[in-house]
Amino acid sequence: MRPISDQTILVTGSTDGLGRRVAAELAARGARVLVHGRDAEKVEQTVRETGAERGLVADLSSLADVRRLAGQIDLLDTLVNNAGVIVPQRSESADGHELTFAVNHLSHFLLTSLLLDRLREPARIVNVASIGQAPLNFDDLMLERGYQAYPAYAQSKLAQVLFSNELAERLRGRDVTVNALHPATMMDTKMVREQLGRPRSSVEEGVAATLRAIADPQLDGVSGRFFDGTRDAAADPQAYDADARRRLWDESERLAGIA
């Protein structure tokens, strides 16, 4: 892989929490960092305070915004799909999709698909997932027959792992790796404090694990893995079900309008 100082790196959801800290550390190491958020003022502030090269504004609950975001990027070495939400009550995106699934999985599926041809090999795609995972119910992906906030979050995060594993298979032959990770358990972030309760780990732990996935030379050529922090780990069994992975891929293409 290229040195960090010779890379352009996009970190989604990087105006707060883990994403902001990762972006700041990458910028400190000399990377050309593209920070992203949905609030223009917070994006501008993050650029100033982290030394990022550019700020990009997009609401990931809107597929049109995701397309506009991708259209602003010419070349990329590393894509970090970090943005995520926990939604207390069932809500729908601008496109009519269940909001947690739309932001945590579908937006990143579309963004990654649109940026694949703009990745400068060797390249890395890092999907920030979670050890909290729930199997996908393909008969009710939009959770119309019952909604609970944490199971919805856990399903969306497992979707990211299925997506990672399937994309890793589809990119065989290209020098592009795709891995997913659980950065740390209940980090001390605003989202955790407001939605899940008392934090159990520091943001610094999550930053270290995420930076390893982004920059560790020992992971050159390593693809289709799930990491719990810095350790290899097993995801939910559904992540290794080829039929489930393909079914999610096909459904994601349909929902994102790229089928």
Regions found by a protein language model. Name each.
Residues 50-64:
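Rossmann-fold cofactor-recognition segment
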Residues 84-92, 97-98, 121-175, 182-197:
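Catalytic loop of short-chain dehydrogenase/reductase
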